[in-house]
């Protein structure tokens, strides 16, 4: 009998952990709620992968950086762009420090190596180091203020095709 009670308790605890309250402000799990299901159709996606090769770094959006496309845009039908950005040393403020924004739905940046310092409208200046991550809201004005000679970033953007607007 005790074994059956323990099993029932464990099952109840597992059910408690695996349900979330829909619309909750935090990721805490709540008893008795269910997770919302995706109902809108999604673009077809296909499996893809990318291995590191130095020769894959090429010119891109910024003249002061080289980009390694990770092949995500074609695999997601243009829904997502992902690339590694390698900044070209040395930092040249006259070329790099131009205020701009990106007309995107989502932009996430993760520092792989080195550091980068940027200023964001309404947020001030921040220095990010290897292991740091940030999200830039759509159209937030920002300026790169500096970066290390070995700076590399992973950038993920939605949609894959977006406009960058330079401000003077």
Which residues make up each language-model segment?
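A short beta-loop-beta micro-motif enriched in histidine and acidic residues
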Residues: 62, 75-80, 91-108, 149
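A short hydrophobic beta-strand segment most commonly corresponding to one strand
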Residues: 82-84, 135, 148-166
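A short, N-terminal "cap"/entry segment at the start of jelly-roll beta-barrel domains
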Residues: 3-8, 14-90, 166-168
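Short beta-strand His + acidic residue motifs that chelate non-heme Fe in jelly-roll/DSBH
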Residues: 98, 118-119, 136-137, 141-148
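Short, conserved beta-strand element in jelly-roll/cupin
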Residues: 84-87, 101-118, 156-159
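Short coil/turn motifs at secondary-structure junctions
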Residues: 90, 143, 158-161
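Short acidic-glycine-tyrosine-enriched beta hairpin
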Residues: 122-139
